[in-house]
Amino acid sequence: SSEKIADDLDAALSEVSSAQHNLEGRLRVASLSGSFADQVVGPAMNEMAALHPNVEIVIDFNARQVDILSEGYDFAIRAGPMQDSGLIARPLTSRTRVAAASPEYLASNGKPLHPAELKDHQCILTHSNKWRFTEKGKLLDVAVTGRLNLNSGQAILDGCSRGLGIAYMAIGGFGKTLSDGTLTPILNDFWHTDRSIHILRPDRRYTPRRVEVAISILEAFAERARAHEIQTIRALL
């Protein structure tokens, strides 16, 4: 339940904060941008700042792949497959990708019932022209096309809401548009979930306590956000 989630978060935060009032120094983090950054990373690091007033926090919200070691970051938050970089990769959370379109788009273009039918639709792309779905427990990669290619979740959401095509992105990026009827979820049986967000940090013998505490807070916020996502998904299915 949402009450249990809130209680668990409070317990986790009190645990990481109780003995840590003397933390100090600088915390430097590189984070992916987008809905996860806005809904989880930013609030978690603001919580860190509120709990530990002697810690200076610098967060770089950026899509580029930083060099953690040479650029002096304590850790990075990244999505997608992890390359073997000599860094420690720690899974942070899973994400479920959801396909959706506006009622107007579906009325004009029809509603695809299988991912293979997306070849006949305008898909709003980001980075890749392949979308990954799951069919009966197996991965299904589908080539898609579209005249919009956007690397901003907000821009994708706006274009989708205006009937310009089908969006397929992490459920957190849709905000309230799925529950309030602005957008209609489609291909519900094929949505793909992967453990795609990781914390990357240097492989050091000694990790400063402020870094360990920041990661603990981040994990608590990510767990709460994921639990809310699962509730939202269940309500849509």
Across the structure, where does each feature detected by a protein language model lie?
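Alpha-helical "hinge/linker" immediately C-terminal to small N-terminal DNA-binding modules
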Residues: 1-21
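C-terminal effector-binding regulatory domain of bacterial HTH transcription factors
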Residues: 17, 50, 54, 171-180, ...
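Central regulatory/effector-binding core of bacterial HTH transcription factors
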Residues: 25-88, 231-235
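Short beta-strand-to-loop elements that line the ligand-binding cleft
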Residues: 56-61, 125, 143-152, 190
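Paired acidic/hydrophobic, glycine-rich loop segments that form the ligand-binding mouth/hinge
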Residues: 75-78, 165-169, 185
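Flexible hinge/capping segments at coil-to-helix
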Residues: 86-97, 101-124
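Short beta-strand->loop
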Residues: 89-92, 145, 181-192
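Secondary-structure junction motif
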Residues: 119-140
